[in-house]
């Protein structure tokens, strides 16, 4: 892997003399107070501006400020006109546009395509403060305001839509976001390196159209430049020329080949022979090789080609060996440079050590921003995830190589949070990242890591080259909880339990000191079919971890419970799989509080399965095995009903399905049955989805969540089966006795 220029080695821009601002300005008045006559760079974002390293606009803004640039923020502008996009004036260098920390469509719509009633990234949690496809709208308004100013597109929405992608909300393949956004260049993934490099080059007078060699960027060009070797991957199932089958009954002396051999003339002198070049171009280095994907027009009309393109894209994600990609859109090409080089520990410390205020901008007054409230007292210790779950975008966006901060940097941030953030009570709500326990876990050999093309380091089993030592993380936990003024360090990030069982010492440390009653883990399913499509470990690994968790909890004298996450309707899931999951849930005393159906997000491997019915984890052909897909609303409701098998509202649907599946034996009023024969009046039943507002009650076994909200579970009656008395009351009610009283239905 080629070395990258360290972020702190660039010369500072002349405006460094102004020094860091208390907050990056959001108005002309703030610019005047700072003594600025203009901004060099203006960041437009769909989120409220929170000056905290968990928010993208703060990290990019502070990093550019540290390079000497004057950076302004336009947060959640009114997109109905260009006026809000002009309130800070014309930027000297460029507009940086991002939809926010989430894809704007996922932020606004549920997996069932219903409009959400709130937005966690807006003051007061109000919905409707950003448009659908915000990256497109903001980019177009910036160009409308100042047509000659470069627009640089970034953020997770743009990153995952950089290629022709399936759009769940329109149920079609859309072209690259670059073709619709009128942006000049797109930065994908963690964009610190790319944005600093481009800002420096634009400041030196280079045209944005000439910047085509920065890793982690995508842009439009007409043709492949000279000196590049192009690999054609636009088709699949391309057999070579097949030789004619020889008839074994024909006398070889009668064939034309023999006649030619006998009449062959003088042999060519070997001294006069010349080497013939068979390849159109000699093989060049990977740095000068580009893979041509099927065009937008082809993948739009051919789901199998779409799956093939998705497979090639994911095979080219390791920064150590990835090649450039190109995809034709009409008369032009969209070109994708290889992914950015991961940041070193020193660079991570540099980025997270900026002078963040760690609070929302004062312009929001006392209005609370739910996303900030959730991470207010948390610390991010690393980036990246090598799990490779096919339904998740973290690996695609942050990369498979873990980027770690040093212990000193993390401890300094905890101390700063303790001393600066109002309301700190001594409890750090999370010390983690995309995954709680991948800190400093990496391949044993940098050379192997550089050449690896596996989509996951832990599926189908933990790679023998992966160093699963958790000692550095254990040491960090001990240092953090020893700090004066820190009472408790909680771990709220999702735990990769298949890694944790490799280190019993880590599990003991975690369970003894860092669990606040509940610990989130994500088995996602119990059946092998969907788990293989998700690239998740078998349920047996969960059982091993559960044994460890309960053992160490008992030794610590603590009442603690696991909160497992499950997904309904994921590609590869059959009705029988969901039935078996429901039986497992009942057998283990779990009752789902919230239910999440699979959400096809742009560019995810599972989304390619959903759209194409093929499995991109293996070589894709027109004849390759298909994947079971759950698309109809009725079947999605059924799969969610299996997860909430205890909810009377879903019982009619479950009875019908069980009879159709030949499993009517599961309908009855005994403990071994899944659904009862009676149907109580559920008119007063309240949905558990009510805005995630019910506070958590006392700790009880049997809770589980199937939405990855990060919020605490709500109180319920736990996972206890109905008592005989409850069953008798419900049966009597169903038969018409005691009509004046509702049965006590556990929720």
From Swiss-Prot:
Details of cofactor binding: Binds 1 [4Fe-4S] cluster. The cluster is coordinated with 3 cysteines and an exchangeable S-adenosyl-L-methionine.
Q: Which family does it belong to?
A: Belongs to the UPF0313 family.
Q: Where does [4Fe-4S] cluster bind?
A: 385, 389, 392
Cofactor or coenzyme needed: [4Fe-4S] cluster
Domain Radical SAM core, by residue range, is: 371-640
Identify the stretch(es) annotated as Disordered.
670-747
Alphabetized GO MF terms: 4 iron, 4 sulfur cluster binding; catalytic activity; iron ion binding
Tell whether Transmembrane is among the UniProt keywords. Answer: no
Q: Does the keyword 4Fe-4S apply?
A: yes
| Keywords for this protein | 4Fe-4S, Iron, Iron-sulfur, Metal-binding, S-adenosyl-L-methionine
Pfam families associated with the record: DUF3362, Radical_SAM, Radical_SAM_N
Q: Which Gene3D superfamilies match?
A: tm_1862 like domain
Q: What is this protein called?
A: UPF0313 protein PA4928
Q: Which InterPro entries match?
A: Elp3/MiaA/NifB-like_rSAM (IPR006638), Methylthiotransferase_CS (IPR020612), rSAM (IPR007197), rSAM_horseshoe (IPR023404), UPF0313 (IPR022946), UPF0313_C (IPR024560), UPF0313_N (IPR013704)
